Amino acid sequence: MDLQAQLEELKTKTLETLQSLTGNHTKELQDLRVAVLGKKGSLTELLKGLKDLSNDLRPVVGKQVNEVRDLLTKAFEEQAKIVEAAKIQAQLDAESIDVTLPGRQMTLGHRHVLTQTSEEIEDIFLGMGFQIVDGFEVEKDYYNFERMNLPKDHPARDMQDTFYITEEILLRTHTSPVQARTLDQHDFSKGPLKMVSPGRVFRRDTDDATHSHQFHQIEGLVVGKNISMGDLKGTLEMIIKKMFGEERSIRLRPSYFPFTEPSVEVDVSCFKCGGKGCNVCKKTGWIEILGAGMVHPSVLEMSGVDAKEYSGFAFGLGQERIAMLRYGINDIRGFYQGDQRFSEQFN
């Protein structure tokens, strides 16, 4: 077969093969292009035969070679567009969404257990005549520490690692600053002050099963004439019974807080074993629940309240602590991980 006939045969077979590659055949198309037009392809091999042609025939066949190469090059380009379109269509078909199918049912959210606990506690205090007072999470060092009888050189400041924003501005470590601000504004000629302040507080602590760098407190304050430790105990007994059941009892143990004098730790009788001793109460029959005490005279005096005429008590409890005890939760981190499986248990 002469060279011209071989060129025509190569052109015809290549075009026929190209027309068959109409689907997602990117690799096959590339392989064919290399086999025909590549440096070691069929057309290149045929070009080597030009040297054996006569001087008269060589220009004619050379022109035919160029025409075949140009034709096949254009044919490969056009077929590449067809193959790419087929590839895109195949991808669209594979990823298409049937809009007639019913949608996925929306998952219902649940009120967070801490929200439930906070509202229950607030309702108890509202029923006892307390007012709910909100405060600032970003607070002045003055109100967070100094007004709580913790001057700058007081060693008890080491009890609380603090997130400082500036030397005088911080994230509050307790909700006690609200008590100081409310004391400043209260008009005692209209009666005693009875308030609770719920809110989030922050301490530089390493997160683990029982500690968190942020948590929630509810602190209470009662200031008036002739307020005694007996009033504190009676108030706490009523709160504990409403939260944990009428059969619960409390005990007060001496403690120390800079802003109260005297200060006490409050324990509740174990609600699992009834005071007999178990793993929850560590065989003691009692569970530590909150801290409290009579308001320190210095705290009253700094608000312009005559400590000789007025007295009061304060207490603070943690919402996470209450919720963990009530619901048997053993890891505080569960409150903050946003796991719906955790939240829906308390719906």
From Swiss-Prot:
It comes from the Bacteria. It is found in: Cytoplasm. One of its GO terms (cellular component) is cytoplasm. Disulfide bonds: none annotated. Mg(2+) binds at residue 261. It is an enzyme of class 6 (ligase). GO terms for molecular function: ATP binding; catalytic activity, acting on a protein; magnesium ion binding; phenylalanine-tRNA ligase activity; transferase activity; tRNA binding. It catalyses: tRNA(Phe) + L-phenylalanine + ATP = L-phenylalanyl-tRNA(Phe) + AMP + diphosphate + H(+). Tetramer of two alpha and two beta subunits. PANTHER family: PHENYLALANINE--TRNA LIGASE, MITOCHONDRIAL, PHENYLALANYL-TRNA SYNTHETASE. This is Phenylalanine--tRNA ligase alpha subunit.
